[in-house]
Amino acid sequence: MITRHAIFVGRVKAGQEAAMRAYVKAELEPLWRQFACAKEVKVSYGVEQDPNGPQIPLMLAITYEDETGMAAALDSPARYTSRDLLPGFYDRFFEDVTLLHYVME
């Protein structure tokens, strides 16, 4: 099994934390759950941050059986749809944001 993590590093606009979570739950998470070959989808929200580290308000972890399954997910229509929503998501809810991806066993 491998897990692909999407880590949203940045600052949510003041007062937009609840709205950001609601948007993720209503718009992005249903798409992420449609990724081909996904075995488990976990969405996590930052609650407590290391004072010396970067702000991470949102993390996504999707687990696949293997790299072939992950490749199918990255080429699935739901992935492209969710990716196309990200610029508007960033503009609406973030002061600044960088999206990082890591694949872990």
Residue ranges of predicted features:
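Surface-exposed beta-loop interaction hotspot
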Residues: 1-2, 105
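Short amphipathic alpha-helices within nucleic acid-binding modules
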Residues: 18, 65-77
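Active-site-adjacent beta-strand/loop module that shapes the phosphate/pyrophosphate-binding cleft
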Residues: 59, 63-65
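Glycine-rich beta-strand-turn "strand-cap" elements at beta-sheet edges
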Residues: 39-56, 82-105
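Active-site-flanking beta-strand signature of metal-NTP-handling nucleotidyl enzymes
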Residues: 2-11, 59
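Short amphipathic alpha-helical segments
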Residues: 16-43, 78-89
